[in-house]
Swiss-Prot record:
Superkingdom to which the source organism belongs: Bacteria
Any Pfam family the entry gives: DUF1190
Residues forming coiled coils: none
Protein name stated in the entry: UPF0441 protein YgiB
Feature: compositional bias, Low complexity: 178-195
Compositionally biased tracts (Polar residues): 204-223
Family: Belongs to the UPF0441 family.
Residue ranges of the region described as Disordered: 178-223
HAMAP family (UniProt xref): UPF0441
Organism (species): Shigella boydii serotype 18 (strain CDC 3083-94 / BS512)
């Protein structure tokens, strides 16, 4: 009798586990699937200007122009700002800098400092922009300004980078690439001036972090 009771007890535990673990396993799988969807990447196109975009997307000239103009406004708000033209040129190269609008994200005290030293403050020209679908499945397009240095000594030389210094490869318009959805999110407004070489340091740090993350991912996939 004791033996029979033991067998039945074990059978009960087995059946209980089967009934109760299956829904849990399904729930865990669902969570991972949802997380995967939330972190899914975005396919974007890289253009130098609205004309490049229009040539690649016949019939969408208006959308291309709107995205380009929005990217220019975003560049004014988020691009690295320098107190002097010389500081900007040292980072991005001759002919790659412009005076920034006084209202372009800078705090009043920093505007005053820049105006005292050079009459204005400076920012790099927008070298191109990323264009992709709006987050949330909207019918319009999202855009992100890109910058590039012509100074061979800069870590940003010949590369497309966003306002945070993240590197998106060679500064070659017309490319399509896959980026995290966060890449298209609005960047913080620039509220202080950058010291000479400061943006290049940010690009170098971001590149190191990207390489480290890629290496970690590869090792994980390989076991």
């Amino acid at each position: 009798m004791k033996r029979t009771k033991s067998i039945r007890h074990a059978s009960f535990r087995k059946n209980w586990s089967a009934r109760h673990l299956t829904p849990v396993a399904l729930a865990v799988a669902t969570v991972f699937m949802l997380a995967s969807c939330e972190k899914s990447d975005e396919t974007v196109s890289l253009y130098q200007n609205a004309d490049d975009c229009s040539a690649a997307n016949p019939g969408k000239s208006a959308e291309c122009t709107t995205a380009y103009n929005n990217a220019l406004k975003e560049a004014e708000r988020t691009a690295p700002k320098y107190a002097t033209r010389e500081d900007c040129v040292a980072e991005f190269g001759e002919g790659q800098c412009q005076q920034a609008p006084a209202q372009a994200g800078m705090a009043p005290e920093n505007q005053a400092q820049a105006q005292q030293s050079s009459g204005s403050f400076w920012m790099p020209l927008m070298a191109g922009y990323m264009m992709g679908r709006l987050m949330g499945g909207g019918a319009g397009f999202a855009q992100q300004p890109l910058f590039s240095s012509k100074n061979p000594a800069s870590p940003a030389y010949g590369k497309y980078t966003d306002a945070t210094g993240k590197n998106y490869g060679a500064a070659q318009p017309g490319r399509t690439m896959t980026v995290p959805k966060t890449a298209m999110a609005p960047k913080p407004a620039t509220t202080t001036t950058v010291t000479r070489g400061g943006f290049g340091e940010s690009v170098a740090k971001q590149s190191t972090m990207q390489r480290s993350a890629t290496g970690t991912s590869s090792r994980s996939m390989g076991g």
